[in-house]
């Protein structure tokens, strides 16, 4: 067991030790975690804030070997970079309390406000020529590019306050559920910093390791960021051309279709078992356009290439009657969920884009 990952020691509360033993016994006897134990303990419960991460352990030994042998970092560079890395317990707590878990009526007001709408409309006018070019060359609707920019970084005014390198280390070391994912993000972050001559210790971002005005995670930057200002350098911190074009390029890479539908309301009740099951199964469960029109008794525009639709239930505030508002998410909606794996996020982007396109 690695030091810096689990603290099943004198630091661990006796109740935690007892519950941990129950979980271990369940795994031994039944080969799986009991349902009630899957949520306990959370990663933050198993560490002490500020405790040193053991970079001599097997996980870091393998990481350093890959960084040396595959990516040509020197041991001296690694020793300097990783000296003193430690657990930030707040990062682990935030990972388990993400906004996407809120009901939609609590979620959307976090992002769609009169101030955001007003600023977004100003940005549409300010960058009209650039957005014309983005639509012509990349093929993504301008309001959605601006909406994502507004939600991700408040149009560049909020890049995040966490050191990205200092954040990615505890997520790799002490967040077992996604350790493999954050290991890759840590590698990609070091590579992009080296390629762009950036000091890894100076980059600020979100608690999940996203950075810049796009709030790309490192692997997304590597794959989708583009230079659109002619300098051949991908700058998601200061170049508005690169920032907006990179957002558009991401959506384009997931088959965004210009001027195509994003979502359509289909009522407050689902009228077929297929639609109910699709809603319960999440964003990857697609249903045919004809099934939605037939079951709901409504007319819908056909999706591009007759691709499938996502069925999304959005919680209505109890003071407004409660229940759900259901929408059919089109392929463009699905492109937004490729950016952020959340139907609520995609809906907030869509409704903000609509507000930016309105005359009010």
Question: Each predicted region: which residue ranges?
Answer:
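C-terminal soluble interaction/assembly domains
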Residues: 271-360
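Bacterial N-terminal signal peptides
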Residues: 20-31
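An acidic, Gly/Ser/Thr/Pro-rich helix-cap/linker signature
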Residues: 38-126, 132-135
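Bacterial N-terminal signal peptides that target proteins for export
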Residues: 4-22
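Sec/Tat signal peptide C-region and signal peptidase I cleavage site
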Residues: 33-37
């Amino acid at each position: 067991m690695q030091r810096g990952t689990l603290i099943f020691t004198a630091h661990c509360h006796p109740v935690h030790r007892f519950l941990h033993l129950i979980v271990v016994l369940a795994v031994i006897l039944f080969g799986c975690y009991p349902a009630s134990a899957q949520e306990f303990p959370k990663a933050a419960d198993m560490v002490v804030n500020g405790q040193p991460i053991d970079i001599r352990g097997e996980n870091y030994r393998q990481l350093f070997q890959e960084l040396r042998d595959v990516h040509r970092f020197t041991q001296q560079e690694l020793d300097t970079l990783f000296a003193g890395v430690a657990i930030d317990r707040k990062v682990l707590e935030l990972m388990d309390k993400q906004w996407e878990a809120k009901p939609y009526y609590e979620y959307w007001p976090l992002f769609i406000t009169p101030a955001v709408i007003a600023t977004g409309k100003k940005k549409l006018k300010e960058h009209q020529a650039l957005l014309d070019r983005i639509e012509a060359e990349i093929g993504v609707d301008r309001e959605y590019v601006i909406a994502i920019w507004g939600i991700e970084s408040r149009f560049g005014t909020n890049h995040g306050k966490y050191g990205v390198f200092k954040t990615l280390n505890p997520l790799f070391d002490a967040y077992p559920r996604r350790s493999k994912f954050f290991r890759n993000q840590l590698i990609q972050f070091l590579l992009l910093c080296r390629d762009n001559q950036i000091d890894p210790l100076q980059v600020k971002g979100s608690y999940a390791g996203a950075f810049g005005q796009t709030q790309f995670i490192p692997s997304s930057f590597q794959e989708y960021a583009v230079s659109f200002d002619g300098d051949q350098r991908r700058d998601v911190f200061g170049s508005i051309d690169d920032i907006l074009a990179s957002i558009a390029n991401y959506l384009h890479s997931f088959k965004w279709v210009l001027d195509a539908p994003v979502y359509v309301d289909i009522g407050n009740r689902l009228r077929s078992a297929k639609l109910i099951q699709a809603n319960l199964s999440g964003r990857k469960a697609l249903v045919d356009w004809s099934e939605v029109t037939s079951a709901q008794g409504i007319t819908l525009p056909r999706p591009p290439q007759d691709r499938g639709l996502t069925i999304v239930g959005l919680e209505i505030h109890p003071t407004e009657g409660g229940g759900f508002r259901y929408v059919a998410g089109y392929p463009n909606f699905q492109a937004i969920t490729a950016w952020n794996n959340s139907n609520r996020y995609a809906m907030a982007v869509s409704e903000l884009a609509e507000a930016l396109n309105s005359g009010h």
